[in-house]
Amino acid sequence: FSEISQFDRYIRPAVYTKLHDKVQEILNVTIEELTCIGHDFTDVANDFIRWCGDDYIFCTWGQTDLTELQRNFDYYNIEYNFPMPFLFYDVQKLYSICFQDSKERTTLKNAIEHLGMQELEGYHSAGSDARYTSQIMPELDFEKVRKFYSVDTYRIPQNIKEEIYLDFGNYGKYISRGFADREEAANDKEVTACRCFKCNKTMKRIIKWFSTNSKSYYGLFSCQEHGLIKGRFRIKSTDDKQYYAIRILKCTDEEGGKKIKMRQQREKEHRRAKRLGTPE
């Protein structure tokens, strides 16, 4: 990796015209300074889109930046043509795969300190955080993490043909189209399908999908070729109140299967106690 150019601009506040004292302390800038030196968001956004060009991929620290970017674009009616599905690299996740347990999420500052890098500027400003993130990327085993894209879901599939299927080797991810309500999403045939993410063959249901709340569902299946597969899907909502599912199917073993069974048993006991009005 090598730097080609930088894009770093201050935005003139238009919607929120006050800064909390803590935010001002972290950013080391006042609202008066932002008003004075900041630029109009629409101008900066269009310059940024032109700066990106046609051949790019976003690399962020965390998963929320691109959602907020598009939310602001829509608020200001700025035209943009990001790809669909919108794949990007969450460097925080890639760092965890390379240096942690793949599940933990550490701060940018902790990652920089762990790698023994110089801290020549502060944190929490867009420019400095982007520079620190770019310094971490060459330290990753990129051949190991290259396939682990993240998917931004600010925009979701609009129909069955656009639904997203990704295979990451030991697990597969599916993102559904939008539905009118949670129940419709949770009961959709494709959302609850039990086809192996590797061979696409129908699996045997060992534990049917069950919910632990109105958002999360779990299941356990067996593929004749690929063995035990555990499943989880969550129902989420978009800004315009569409409901969609993100489903993960992952290879597991007997121990992983036992954990799913234990989770199901705990949920049954919880519901039984709730019906009877007895303490758990």
Give the location of each predicted region.
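Conserved non-catalytic scaffold segment of RNase H-like nuclease domains
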Residues: 1-67, 229-273
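Active-site-proximal helix-loop-helix substrate-binding element of RNase H-like nuclease domains
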Residues: 15-18, 24-27, 31-34, 94-130
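Acidic two-metal-ion nuclease catalytic site recognized across multiple nuclease folds
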Residues: 139-280
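Conserved beta-strand -> loop -> alpha-helix junction used to position metal-binding or nucleic-acid-contacting
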Residues: 81-95
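Short aromatic/hydrophobic-glycine micro-motifs
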Residues: 29, 78, 117, 201-203, ...
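Short, surface-exposed basic-aromatic patches at helix termini and helix-loop junctions that form
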Residues: 50, 74-78
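Short, conserved catalytic or adaptor-binding loops enriched in Gly and charged residues
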Residues: 1, 79-82
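Acidic, Mg2+-coordinating catalytic module of metal-dependent nucleases/exonucleases
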Residues: 57-73, 107-169
